[in-house]
Amino acid sequence: MENYSSNCYGFMHAGLLNSEDEFYLSRDEAFEWINGIKALDKKLNKIQWNTSDTIADCLSENNENKYNIIEIFDWDKKSQHVAFLDYDWNFYDQDGPDWPIRLWENIEDLLHEYKNMLWWTAYYQIHILNKDLSTKVENFLDEL
């Protein structure tokens, strides 16, 4: 799957389906069928490790599944990016077509990237996946 071409929402959608198909989707298209996922909704803290600690607390409280989703928003709460997030603080994503798939990178790197890009005004959500979806994501990522 080296040539996998998708945006971040399409990559997430493919993972939730455990599909080898490539998708280029809007945020609404990617999320429309997974209603009911619980979410933690917070503002990115200017002190990055405070955000990391909050995410770690959320993951430790919801550690029954290996994978969840982190979604990052701009000041207007418009979604900017999604990535899979495991309980070891690693994220897995694809930014856009022909961009490399990032696997097993530390969430601190993603937070730093978006904190700088969105000038300290971004929000984030943690979407907690159910066991079935988490397993599909695990199988999808194992095949990459």
Mark where each language-model region is.
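Residues that form generic nucleotide/phosphate-binding pockets
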Residues: 15, 33, 43, 58, ...
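Short amphipathic alpha-helical segments that mediate assembly, nucleic-acid/protein binding
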Residues: 27-30, 40, 55, 107, ...
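Cysteine-nucleophile protease catalytic domains, especially the papain-like/related folds used
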Residues: 1-50
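Intrinsic-disorder/low-complexity loop/linker signature
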Residues: 21, 44, 75-78, 89, ...
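Noncatalytic regulatory segments and standalone regulatory/sensor domains
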Residues: 102-144
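Active-site-adjacent substructure of cysteine-protease-like catalytic cores
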Residues: 52-84
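Catalytic Cys-His active-site segments of thiol-dependent hydrolases/isopeptidases
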Residues: 71-74, 82-107
